[in-house]
Curated annotation (Swiss-Prot):
Gene3D superfamilies xref list: 1.10.8.60, ClpX chaperone, C4-type zinc finger domain, P-loop containing nucleotide triphosphate hydrolases
Quaternary organization: Component of the ClpX-ClpP complex. Forms a hexameric ring that, in the presence of ATP, binds to fourteen ClpP subunits assembled into a disk-like structure with a central cavity, resembling the structure of eukaryotic proteasomes.
Species, as recorded: Cupriavidus pinatubonensis (strain JMP 134 / LMG 1197) (Cupriavidus necator (strain JMP 134))
Protein known as: ATP-dependent Clp protease ATP-binding subunit ClpX
Keyword hit for ATP-binding: yes
UniProt-annotated binding residues for ATP: 123-130
Family stated for the protein in its record: Belongs to the ClpX chaperone family.
Function text: ATP-dependent specificity component of the Clp protease. It directs the protease to specific substrates. Can perform chaperone functions in the absence of ClpP.
GO cellular component: HslUV protease complex
Binding, Zn(2+): 15, 18, 37, 40
PANTHER family: ATP-DEPENDENT CLP PROTEASE ATP-BINDING SUBUNIT CLPX-LIKE, MITOCHONDRIAL, ATP-DEPENDENT CLP PROTEASE ATP-BINDING SUBUNIT CLPX-LIKE, MITOCHONDRIAL-RELATED
Amino acid sequence: MAEKKGSSSEKLLYCSFCGKSQHEVKKLIAGPSVFICDECIDLCNEIIRDEATASEKDAAAATRSDLPTPHEIRESLDQYVIGQEQAKKILAVAVYNHYKRLKHLGKKDDVELSKSNILLIGPTGSGKTLLAQTLARLLNVPFVIADATTLTEAGYVGEDVENIIQKLLQNCNYEVEKAQRGIVYIDEIDKISRKSDNPSITRDVSGEGVQQALLKLIEGTMASVPPQGGRKHPNQDFLQVDTTNILFICGGAFDGLEKVIMQRSDKTGIGFAAQVQSKEEREVSEVLPQTEPEDLIKFGLIPELIGRLPVVATLAKLDETALVQILIEPKNALVKQYQKLLAMEGVELEIRPAALSAIARKAIRRKTGARGLRSILEQSLMDVMYDLPNYKGVQKVVIDESTINGDAPPLLMYEEQQPKVSGSN
């Protein structure tokens, strides 16, 4: 019972949990027909604190108990991404420091470590998205890719920036703790640059406005996400996701940024002793590593957003040699993938060195980088893959330079028969 009659006819109140009377404790708090004392409240708080600390430790351990070193991260990236050595080194250090910081979150320290988000600058098909995907797979953390061009300010038609966090939650079955240690890759970040470096009086709902909205997300905020997806409406409960420890990697081609950099560097090269190079002599890949925050501001990113992306890595345009390596060397190389597909039909695929070079040159002409390699190879093998299940006795398919250039179909080699070209009667 929470109350009993004493000898002096006064009602004695007792704690409903520990049974102590009001005279044995400092405070007794009343509820509907129940009471709780200050000692029981302290005990409950202690239990909650212990559970919170334990869950934080578990989450940190789940992030990665055996966090790979920068060298190990770099070696893993090498298995999937060809070239871009400096960018891989910068990313390895940044990601290692980020997750090392998360592992030590529960510990008391005088120095608070801030988050270092990453900005990747490089042409289309240079490996920006692949680098981010590979990092997430290596660290076994939730990962999502968002397209900055589809985002608008809240209240306008288009995707709200908080939709990014909703997609991240979907990728980890709505486990909030996991999502709060994930990686978000925001592609095409350069496409939301403001139209000029002077603030405009007109509304720019897909430019500076989106940058401002992203800024809050990147620096850390409590994002309200509808449970199990769906649209927001006032009478529903929201999942609260703290974005403070989510690693944001932003990437973009930044076409024209090299001109901004050259204008700045040309101003410094004045005087009799100055060495002035013509603009034509300077390759874009030579200029981009000289990127300074002022260049990005001139390009159209707001200073606050640049301040939240302190780690900047530039990726070079891939040349013919690098593209050929991409076709054959990585673990999931395109040539290996198509060889596996044809092996399922019991057929060997041979792509000759001249054909590999022709594929690389075609991708360079199309200005698609590594991204365009698959479509070129798919186009060259389309007829073969269509007809192969109907052919009997095919042992090998050979692709040479003429096939890639569209001058001749692939060569089909039969068991103990003469070679035959695909599609011939």
